[in-house]
Amino acid sequence: MRFAFIKKDLTRHRLISIGLTICIMMTSFLAASAAQMTIQLNGSISNLLDSAKAPDFVQMHDGTLNEKDIDIFSSKQSMVKAHQIVPMIQIEHVNIRFGHEPAKAGVMDHLFVKQNRDFDFLLNEQNEKLTVNKGEVAVPIYFQQKYHLNIGETLLIEKGAHQFSFRIKAFLRDAQMNPSLVSSKRFLLHNDDWNAINQVFQKKEYLIEFLLHDAAQADAFQTIYQSTQLPQQGPSVTLPLLRMLNALTDGMVIAILLLVCILLISIALLSLRLAMIASIEEDEREIGILKVLGIPLTKIKQLYVGKYAVLACAGCIAGYVLTLIFGDMFAVNIQQYMGNQHSFAHWLIPLLVSIVTAIIIITFSYAVLRKFGQISAAQAIQGGLTSSNHKKQIPMHLKKNRFLPVNIWLGLKDLLSRKKLYTTITCIIALCTFLMLIPIQLWHTLQSPDFITYLGSGKSDLRIDLRQGNHLKENTNEIESMIGEDQGIQTSAIYETTSLQAKSKENTLETLYLETGELSAFPLTYLQGRQPLKDEEISLSVLNADSLQKKVGEKMTLVTNGHEIQRTVTGIYQDVTNGGKTAKALSQPFPQSALWRTIQIQLKPGVNIAEKKAVFEKKATPAKVTDMKEYVHQTIGSTASIVKVVAFFSALAAFATASLMLFMFLHMLKAKDSSRNYMLRTIGFSIKDITSQYITSFIVVLSFGTFFGTIAVNTIGPALMSAGGASLGASSLQWLSPQWVSIVYPVTLLIVNLALTACLLKTFFSRQTTRHTLL
C-alpha cells in the first residue's frame, strides 16, 4: 500500500516533486563537492609537503652569512635533524625574456636555484623530485599561467654581453613558494648553468632551512633561533604557515561552497515544508478517514515521509553522481599547483555527506508532521489539520476602500490573510538574494583598489620596492631625487622595514617586521586606536597584537642584539602580508640595516599612471615599480579569479533556485485556490483580474524578499567573511564594492522573478487551463 500511495502521490504532484528533487540534488552536489575538495586539498598539501620534504623552519636572509656559525648552532641543537643553506640568485625582470616576450615588472622576485640534495626538493607535475639537464630550466607554474608557456619554449637571461638561453623542460611545484601571496618564485637550473650565471649576477639571497626530529617543536625552535645573532635579515616561516599559505586560495572556495550549501539546504527545507503543508491540506479528509479506520499515526506519517524520503534519496544520489562527474572543476587550482591526490576517502566522505543531507531532509519531514498527534479524527475530517493555515479574517472591507483598485486591494487582502504561507516564499527569495550577492560582493571587494588597506599599506598610485643589496641607500637617494624633480607627483613617502623581536606577556621572543616612515602621508584604517605620532609609539597588526597579547595603551618591549627598548601601542590595523605579523612606527628604535625599502607615490590628478610607471621602470632599475592595482592583482589575483567563478555559479544557482521555487509555489497556489478562483469567475472577475491579484501579492513578496536578502548581505556578510579572514590578519573585512552592486544585482533578480511570475500566471490561468481546473 505504501508503495502505491507514494507512486500515486508523486505522479499527481509531478512538477512539485521534480522541483524538490532538483533543489535537493543541487544541495547534495555542492555539499559533496565541498567535502571532496576539502579531502583533496588536505591530501594534496600533505603529499606535496611530504614529497618535497618541506623544512620545518626556514629563515630567509638577504645579505652575507657565515655558514660555519650556522653549522655550529645546528650541531648544538638536539631538535635539529638536518639543516642546509640554499643560495638563490635574484635576477631582475629586465634581464629575463620568456621566448620573445620580456618579463613584466611586478611584485614577484625571480630566484634561480640548484636542486637541493637532502630536503626541500622542487617537484615536477607528478610530485617527483625534478632534475634538469644542462641548458634546461624548470619554470614555476605561476609563470606558466601568467605567460601561457609551453614545454620546449625558450627562457633567455641577458646582462650586457652575457646571454644564457635555456629550454623549458618542466613546470615545477614549490612547497614553499607556490602561493601567490609569497612574492618570490624559484626557477631550477642545472648546477653548471647556475654556477655560470653566478659569475655574472652577484646578488644572492639565502634560505636557511632546518628539519626537526619533531615538527611540533617548530615554534619553540623559531624562538631559539631568533634569540641568537645568526642571519635573519628576512621573513621566517614554519611548516604550519606553509600549509596555511598553500590552503588559502582553495580554502576560501571551500568556505564559500559551504556557505552556499547552507543557504541551499535552508531553501530546500523551506520548500519541503511548503510542499508538505499543501499536500496535507489537500489530503486532510483522507487522513481523517485513515484515523477513523484505526490506522496508527506512525503508519500515516510513514506514508507521507516515505514520499519525501524517496525524493531526498533520489536527489542526494543524483547530487553524489554529479560530484563524481563534475566535482573536479572546483579543484582545478589544487590539481595544477599541488597535484591530484586521490584516496578512498575522496569518494567515501562525499557519499557520507550526501547521506547526511538525505537524513536531515527526512528528519525535517517528520518534524513538519508533529502536529498530527494533536488532531483527532473528527477534526481531520472537518479540516482541522490545517486550521492554523486557513485564512484569518482581516478587518479589510471593500466598501471602505476608496483609493486602491479592486484587484490590488484583493491581492493585498489575500497576502495578509495567508501571512504564514507568503512568509515562506519571502524567506526563500531572501535566501536566494543572499546566495547571489555574497560571492559577488567578495569578488568586487578583492578587485577594489581599496583592498590594499588589508595588505598593510595606504592607498597610493605607485609603489617602488627596493630590496637589501649593495646599493640600497644609493638607489633610494637617486629615486628620491627623481621624485623631487617630477612635477607630476603630488605626495610621496619612503618606508623602511627591519626585522626585530618583541617580548610577549610570557617573556618569549617573537619576530616582527617594523615599517617606519612618514605614516601620515598614506594613512591606514585602524580597527582600534590611531597611528603613532611620536617616536615612543608603535602600532601592531591584528595577528601581532593577538600573538603578543597587547592592547591599545599597553607597553611592549622591542629587542635586538640584546638591547631592549619600550614602546606604547597606539593602534591595531589589518595586514595579511609577511604572515600577518607587522608593525608601524615613525622611526627605527635601533640602528640596523633595512631588509627593504618601499616608496609610495600619489600622482597629481590627470597624470597617466601607466606612463609615469614606465618612466620610473626605465630610470629606477633595479627597483620594482608597481601600479597599486597591479600589486593587489598579483598578490591575490588567483584567489580573486576563483572567487569570480564561484560568484558566477552562485548567481546562476540563485536565479535557477528562485525560478524553481516560484514555479512550485505558483503551481501549489493554482491547486489550492481552484475553488476560490472558480467563485471569482462566477461573479464576473476575468482571468486578467485574478492574475492581477496574484501579481500584486507577488510584487510585495518579491520586493520584501529581495530587500531583506540585500540588507542581510550588507550586515551579516562582512561578519561571515571576517571570521574566515581573522586567521590571516584581516579580522574586520568590509565590503569595498561599488554601491551599484547592492542595487543592480538584487533589482535584476527582482525583475526576472516578476517577469517569470507573470509568465507562469499567464500559463497557469490561460483559458484552456482555467476552464479545465475550475470546472
What are these regions (language model features)?
Residues 55-62, 143-145, 176-188, 193-238, ...:
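A short beta-strand structural signal in non-transmembrane regions
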Residues 317-352, 370, 692, 698, ...:
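Short helix-loop junctions at transmembrane helix boundaries
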Residues 37, 41-48, 107, 115, ...:
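Peri-transmembrane interface segments
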Residues 46-97, 220, 455-516, 609-611:
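Membrane-proximal extracellular/periplasmic loop immediately following the first transmembrane helix
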Residues 1-29, 305, 391-433, 669-674, ...:
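N-terminal Sec/SRP start-transfer signal
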Residues 12, 16-18, 26-54, 421-423, ...:
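Alpha-helical transmembrane segments
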